[in-house]
């Protein structure tokens, strides 16, 4: 308690009033801190909104450029289909370039980024990817001779390292055939020449009977000798035996062999070499 003298007022500090003032100060400080926090948060959100707006604007521009490029590609495809009516499997690279030139002349300069797509398209194209596929094994033509061998054409050439193999020759060579025939004929002629003396010795016609031995009458007249009687019987049976004809001798001489030269003994004896 403070006492003032004279005409001064007597003032006294109340503790409740002091507590009330302290609370007000604390509330003011807390409100200020809260306002500052909200302000900082609002500033951060505003900056984030501005960055998002910039990104959105860039994306809108990119979408517009892509839409313009898509429209240009659609017009190019339409003009290409009208100028070059062909299938995708049978397209060719030179015709494709001509169509692209005509399409560029009709459509004018393309949008931004068209050259990069064009270069990528040319990089992915290969020389043999657009040409029509050739048949693997061409069949025989009706006007070709059946005796000639058809040589299969190489299909789908993969590179310079791949070499077409020559066709296998099915028919035997005439030189080998002639040599084989000559050797077989020489062997058969040598066999015929070896067998000819034995055949002539076996199939020789019976010789005519010689003149009677001077002792024949003596042997036949002596009935006491049995060996002479046996020899006379053999001679008589040989005389009464009929002689074989020439055709029969030829039939005996000819051997039933499948080889054609056995039927001609003159050719077999001459030993003809082919």
Curated annotation (Swiss-Prot):
SMART domains: BRLZ. GO terms for molecular function: DNA-binding transcription factor activity, RNA polymerase II-specific; RNA polymerase II cis-regulatory region sequence-specific DNA binding. The keyword ATP-binding does not apply. The keyword Signal does not apply. Residues 187-196 have a biased composition (Low complexity). It holds the Pfam family bZIP_1. It is found in: Nucleus. One of its GO terms (biological process) is myeloid dendritic cell differentiation. Coiled coil: none annotated. Residues 17-80 form the bZIP domain. PANTHER family: BASIC LEUCINE ZIPPER TRANSCRIPTIONAL FACTOR ATF-LIKE 2 (PTHR23351:SF11), FOS TRANSCRIPTION FACTOR-RELATED (PTHR23351). AP-1 family transcription factor that controls the differentiation of lineage-specific cells in the immune system. Following infection, participates in the differentiation of CD8(+) thymic conventional dendritic cells in the immune system. Acts via the formation of a heterodimer with JUN family proteins that recognizes and binds DNA sequence 5'-TGA[CG]TCA-3' and regulates expression of target genes. This is Basic leucine zipper transcriptional factor ATF-like 2. It comes from Homo sapiens.
């Amino acid at each position: 308690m403070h006492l003032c003298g004279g005409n001064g007022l007597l003032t006294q500090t109340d503790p409740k009033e002091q507590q009330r003032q302290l609370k007000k100060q604390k509330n003011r400080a807390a409100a200020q801190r809260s306002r500052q926090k909200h302000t900082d948060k609002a500033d951060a959100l505003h900056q984030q909104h501005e960055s998002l707006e910039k990104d959105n604007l860039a994306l809108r521009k990119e979408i517009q450029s892509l839409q313009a490029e898509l429209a240009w590609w659609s017009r190019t495809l339409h003009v290409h289909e009208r100028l070059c009516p062909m299938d995708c499997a049978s397209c060719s690279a030179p015709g494709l370039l001509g169509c692209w030139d005509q399409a560029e002349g009709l459509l004018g300069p393309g949008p931004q980024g068209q050259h990069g797509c064009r270069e990528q398209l040319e990089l992915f194209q290969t020389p043999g990817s657009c040409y029509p596929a050739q048949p693997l094994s061409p069949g025989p033509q009706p006007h070709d001779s059946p005796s000639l061998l058809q040589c299969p054409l190489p299909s789908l050439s993969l590179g310079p390292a791949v070499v077409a193999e020559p066709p296998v020759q099915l028919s035997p060579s005439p030189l080998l055939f002639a040599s084989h025939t000559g050797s077989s004929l020489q062997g058969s002629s040598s066999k015929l020449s070896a067998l000819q003396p034995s055949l002539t010795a076996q199939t020789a016609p019976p010789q005519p009977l010689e003149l009677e031995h001077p002792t024949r009458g003596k042997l036949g007249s002596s009935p006491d000798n049995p060996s002479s009687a046996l020899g006379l019987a053999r001679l008589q049976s040989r005389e009464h035996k009929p002689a074989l004809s020439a055709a029969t001798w030829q039939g005996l001489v000819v051997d039933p062999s499948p080889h054609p030269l056995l039927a001609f003994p003159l050719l077999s004896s001459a030993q003809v070499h082919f």
